[in-house]
């Protein structure tokens, strides 16, 4: 039977010094025979998705200790992509994922913790902690801070989010007063931004992976029901310890839960709900950490068979995450996918023996349990606040309309092809990704003229200066993991294309990535990236590019001979931007770039370089 890892420092005469230090943290004689459970919190006052987490780690800690464990909390960093957006701060966003993963590994392994509770929420924090959990492979449960309530204003017919504030700010026809009103109304509460952006997408995917509890991705941060998720997460962590250390149950460990089948389930959910393209990057990275052979080809295969069953902002202004919860949350989407024969329902979870058992218990269309129905009626209060669990508003009814509601059944899908697709061609040999859920069907096949920019900054200037016109393909390169470095999000270029009325008349292609708030014909993660010799680095001003989503292709319309000639010329010059870019690349960023792989590998470290 496995022994507690913590015995390394809590047992034996020669560990008297270590025990003395443990005692200084508050441990007593009886605690040295209990599991030590690490709580990885991510509280910070910089990020609205994390500003309310300060006391929640101790909430979990008290529950762990009430049911027989010893809790030890620490914090990791959290970067706000929205605040870091549009300047050199965004260079640090994706690299922070690796720092978060490393910091969790460092703390847990240095102190020989027996289990882990991950309190995450925003864009890189959930993926970073997920990578760490799969590296460590000790009993782990995730609980997120929860989504922000959607904003409201009398100046808009629909609810608001961060993207609305960004788009209106670049609209020359909007008054300063209207911009100010949107700014004040778009982000009213604590929590992760209210649409199906990267943070909420990832928190929803942890439900499908089996590593978090039902409602983790959809109960708003302000609602009292989320407190019960935190308390239950503490209890589950102790239960997982008993199952592993007391019974050697492999499904108590992350790698026993997040198997290949579970990754397929998570990606199937992602495609069905039109999640952020960043989720592809993060799932690929997590799979590598868990030694799961899940790759771009698997995502491509799934994207061709999974329909889109849920459509949420930024893909429509009608629904936000709070509306997904009212419709039954992630368990309801998983239920529809299961009935369509699209899931591996025998996959394990931290809270139920199988996913099938979880769906039977939590799918609002399948259970008569009033407690479950009440849980999914948890709604927004519409009161600006930064305090968790501060309201208990409930919808009068659930949205169970599966033919015309927020969540659809397979027969009434928003589209029979899902919300994400992988494209291949001579411009992206190893693939690139597009969120089809946000692309108007009229431009699913698009041929346009290349407008080439060597940085996001240059592209923004060009778009705002009206240098981009209808029919153009904006190409932004040398913004990949190595080339940026850091693979910046291109939210400002896509938002400004909308502001200029070009959202349905142009395409954007980059080796960088996109915010979960992006919509339109925005194609990212072009692999290999330009800095790694990718063909996106060979595109020239005025070239024609053909994008064909139905046939999953993207091609630069030049001959193979011309492409080879350009490659030889570029090899001689070196793969770097033509123009010197005014950005400060620090030693920390250079270290990240040195080991970073392209997006098709999840932009993780190249282990071949480390292994020598």
Curated annotation (Swiss-Prot):
<feature type="binding site">
    <location>
        <position position="123"/>
    </location>
    <ligand>
        <name>Mg(2+)</name>
    </ligand>
</feature>
<dbReference type="InterPro" id="IPR056740">
    <property type="entry name" value="ILV_EDD_C"/>
</dbReference>
<keyword id="KW-0001">2Fe-2S</keyword>
<feature type="binding site">
    <location>
        <position position="122"/>
    </location>
    <ligand>
        <name>[2Fe-2S] cluster</name>
    </ligand>
</feature>
<dbReference type="Pfam" id="PF00920">
    <property type="entry name" value="ILVD_EDD_N"/>
</dbReference>
<comment type="similarity">
    <text>Belongs to the IlvD/Edd family.</text>
</comment>
<protein>
    <recommendedName>
        <fullName>Dihydroxy-acid dehydratase</fullName>
        <ecNumber>4.2.1.9</ecNumber>
    </recommendedName>
</protein>
<keyword id="KW-0411">Iron-sulfur</keyword>
<keyword id="KW-0100">Branched-chain amino acid biosynthesis</keyword>
<feature type="binding site">
    <location>
        <position position="81"/>
    </location>
    <ligand>
        <name>Mg(2+)</name>
    </ligand>
</feature>
<feature type="active site" description="Proton acceptor">
    <location>
        <position position="515"/>
    </location>
</feature>
<keyword id="KW-0479">Metal-binding</keyword>
<comment type="subunit">
    <text>Homodimer.</text>
</comment>
<dbReference type="InterPro" id="IPR004404">
    <property type="entry name" value="DihydroxyA_deHydtase"/>
</dbReference>
<dbReference type="InterPro" id="IPR000581">
    <property type="entry name" value="ILV_EDD_N"/>
</dbReference>
<dbReference type="GO" id="GO:0051537">
    <property type="term" value="F:2 iron, 2 sulfur cluster binding"/>
</dbReference>
<comment type="pathway">
    <text>Amino-acid biosynthesis; L-valine biosynthesis; L-valine from pyruvate: step 3/4.</text>
</comment>
<feature type="binding site">
    <location>
        <position position="489"/>
    </location>
    <ligand>
        <name>Mg(2+)</name>
    </ligand>
</feature>
<comment type="function">
    <text>Functions in the biosynthesis of branched-chain amino acids. Catalyzes the dehydration of (2R,3R)-2,3-dihydroxy-3-methylpentanoate (2,3-dihydroxy-3-methylvalerate) into 2-oxo-3-methylpentanoate (2-oxo-3-methylvalerate) and of (2R)-2,3-dihydroxy-3-methylbutanoate (2,3-dihydroxyisovalerate) into 2-oxo-3-methylbutanoate (2-oxoisovalerate), the penultimate precursor to L-isoleucine and L-valine, respectively.</text>
</comment>
<feature type="binding site">
    <location>
        <position position="193"/>
    </location>
    <ligand>
        <name>[2Fe-2S] cluster</name>
    </ligand>
</feature>
<keyword id="KW-0460">Magnesium</keyword>
<keyword id="KW-0408">Iron</keyword>
<dbReference type="InterPro" id="IPR020558">
    <property type="entry name" value="DiOHA_6PGluconate_deHydtase_CS"/>
</dbReference>
<dbReference type="Pfam" id="PF24877">
    <property type="entry name" value="ILV_EDD_C"/>
</dbReference>
<feature type="binding site" description="via carbamate group">
    <location>
        <position position="124"/>
    </location>
    <ligand>
        <name>Mg(2+)</name>
    </ligand>
</feature>
<feature type="modified residue" description="N6-carboxylysine">
    <location>
        <position position="124"/>
    </location>
</feature>
<dbReference type="GO" id="GO:0004160">
    <property type="term" value="F:dihydroxy-acid dehydratase activity"/>
</dbReference>
<dbReference type="GO" id="GO:0005829">
    <property type="term" value="C:cytosol"/>
</dbReference>
<dbReference type="GO" id="GO:0000287">
    <property type="term" value="F:magnesium ion binding"/>
</dbReference>
<dbReference type="InterPro" id="IPR042096">
    <property type="entry name" value="Dihydro-acid_dehy_C"/>
</dbReference>
<keyword id="KW-0456">Lyase</keyword>
<keyword id="KW-0028">Amino-acid biosynthesis</keyword>
<comment type="pathway">
    <text>Amino-acid biosynthesis; L-isoleucine biosynthesis; L-isoleucine from 2-oxobutanoate: step 3/4.</text>
</comment>
<dbReference type="InterPro" id="IPR037237">
    <property type="entry name" value="IlvD/EDD_N"/>
</dbReference>
<dbReference type="GO" id="GO:0009097">
    <property type="term" value="P:isoleucine biosynthetic process"/>
</dbReference>
<dbReference type="GO" id="GO:0009099">
    <property type="term" value="P:L-valine biosynthetic process"/>
</dbReference>
